[in-house]
Amino acid sequence: YLKVNSFIAFLLVSLCAGVLLGLPLPDLAKSIQKGLGDTLGSLVTIIVLGAMLGKLVASSGAAQQIASTLIRLFGEKNISWGLMFTGFIIGIPLFYNVGFVLMIPLIFALVQKFKLNPLMAGVPMMASLSVAHGYLPPHPSPAALVAQFHANMGTTLTYGIIVSIPAIILAGPIFAKTLSHITPKPLKTFAVQEVQADELPSISSSFLTALLPVFLLVFTTALDVQLGKDSPFSPVLHLISDPAMVMLVAICFATWTLGLRLGKSMEHVMGIYTEAVKDVGMILLIIAGAG
């Protein structure tokens, strides 16, 4: 009986809290509605566009291309470090649950290919995905904090990356070594489904598209600081450095590089975006309820 939907639970708690705090009953419903609107107002565009970008990066094979490239660069001996950086880079545009589902087949494929301990492969990547989801906008929690404290998204992202690096090193490869004595046996029912090599986007397109929001936020923030508030370009910079505008530019760019350019129809790409919105619907409601 106590397993209540999260959104409904937040509404009920808000209602009870309002009554116990002595808010006028006629104003209680309006107060709850205002909290919903104020919280979602600055976040819905960022979260929805971020989910769309992540879904396209995953379904187009760009995430697979990024992972394969980094693993080739790091080599078999340092594969844990390669997976750590893979998880971090992929985790910037992808939500944790999407990245987890996407990367699990890759981890099992590498475990089979290189005879690895599954924990040595999985822990570094999952730690990176988790840290990116918790520390870096445009993910829901950090984006909500940016909105609440009226912080600069680019500055928050920069500091988040700086703090994330030691966190993923400690929680990833270093922690994984302490688990080396544990050797789990993955179920054989996990089927590895990969995009064919000839259907993958190019390495440059994959990296550029996945990291474009990061590049734009850091570049516009640095340029704004360099030029100063009195610059005639300041109003334009403020517009294009707005997180919602950055994500809109990124999604338009991704529609071409990972969609139309690869021969996919506009209808197919828009279908991917529709599925992405379904994936984050409950997240948006929970965030709204918390407001």
Predicted regions and their residues:
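Membrane-embedded alpha-helical segments and adjacent helix-loop junctions characteristic
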Residues: P24-K113, G263-G291
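Alpha-helical transmembrane segments of multi-pass membrane proteins
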Residues: E76-I92, K115-G134, N152-I165
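Membrane-interface helix termini and inter-helical loops of multi-pass transporters
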Residues: L25-G35, I66, P142-T155, D224-H238, ...
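Long, contiguous bundles of hydrophobic transmembrane helices that form the permeation core
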Residues: T158-G271
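Membrane-helix interface "capping/anchor" motifs
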Residues: Y1-I8, Q112-M120
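Membrane-embedded alpha-helical segments of multi-pass transporters/permeases
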Residues: Y1, G18-G22, I92, I168-K177
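Membrane-interfacial helix-loop connectors
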Residues: G18, N97, V101-N117, P142-T156
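Hydrophobic mid-bilayer segments of alpha-helices in multi-pass membrane transport proteins
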Residues: K3-L23, V44-L49, S206-V218, H238-L260, ...
